[in-house]
């Protein structure tokens, strides 16, 4: 029996779809992924997480930490994942781990002696960008950039990206909770946690809600009546 063997539960809703994964200190034990867009993350991630928790209970594992994606990514997706992960961490009095989405793009790639620039397609010719050293440690903060003819990567650097970007580099699949769990495992073993009470996802670019034209006209109408 694995009666009290500790495991890490990873939850990812940062990009398209959602997923969960369970890992011990050495290997992935459980994973479930949904990568379509027809169903909202909010609808599925709760049930996926319950299934993962039930699986742990049935197999005698104890969830010792929660990991989630720190961002950047989908504003709504990040908020959903953060709320769920923080709720579980608070409710179970266990630590929380947050890993950069851009750092996950490097997982599984061969070693590289120079810098790696990770890019995440943000739509409309824009991207989230972050630079990492040969060991995978961030050299700067994630930024929001426009990929135009004037954009270029420093010489001798490697580019890895997700999405449809006009750059020369290595295209990788969007990361899932399996990737998150694999990377977060080292955080867990080093006890590298975030403050659950104060941590918020790194959106990089401030969220701007789009208000429909009818709502704008209604507000103008009400203001004139006041």
What is each residue range found by the language model?
Residues 8-10, 63-69, 77, 116-119:
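Short glycine-aspartate micro-motif
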Residues 30-33:
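Short amphipathic
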Residues 44, 79-80, 111:
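Generic recognition of short, well-ordered alpha-helical segments
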Residues 49-65, 153-158:
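Phosphate/pyrophosphate-binding loops at sites that engage ATP/ADP/AMP, CoA/4′-phosphopantetheine
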Residues 36-54:
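N-terminal phosphate-binding loop and adjacent alpha-helix
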């Amino acid at each position: 029996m694995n009666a009290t063997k500790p495991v890490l539960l990873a939850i990812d809703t940062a990009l398209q779809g959602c997923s969960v994964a369970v890992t011990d200190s050495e290997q992935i034990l459980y994973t479930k992924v949904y990568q379509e867009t027809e169903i909202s993350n909010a609808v599925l991630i709760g049930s996926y997480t319950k299934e993962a928790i039930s699986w742990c209970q049935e197999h005698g594992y104890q969830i010792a930490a929660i990991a989630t994606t720190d961002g950047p990514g989908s504003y709504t997706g990040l908020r959903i994942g953060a709320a769920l992960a923080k709720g579980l961490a608070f409710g179970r009095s266990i630590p929380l781990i947050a890993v950069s989405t851009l750092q996950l793009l490097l997982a599984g790639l061969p070693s590289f002696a120079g810098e790696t620039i990770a890019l995440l397609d943000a739509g409309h010719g824009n991207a989230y960008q972050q630079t990492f050293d040969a060991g995978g440690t961030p050299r700067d903060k994630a930024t929001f950039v426009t990929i135009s003819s004037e954009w270029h990567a420093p010489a001798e650097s490697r580019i890895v990206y997700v999405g449809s970007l006009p750059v020369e580099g290595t295209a990788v699949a969007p990361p899932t909770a399996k990737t998150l769990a694999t990377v977060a495992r080292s955080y867990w073993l080093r006890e590298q946690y975030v403050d659950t009470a104060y941590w918020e996802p790194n959106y990089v670019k401030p969220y701007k809600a789009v208000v429909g034209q009818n709502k704008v006209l209604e507000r103008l109408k009400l203001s004139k009546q006041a």
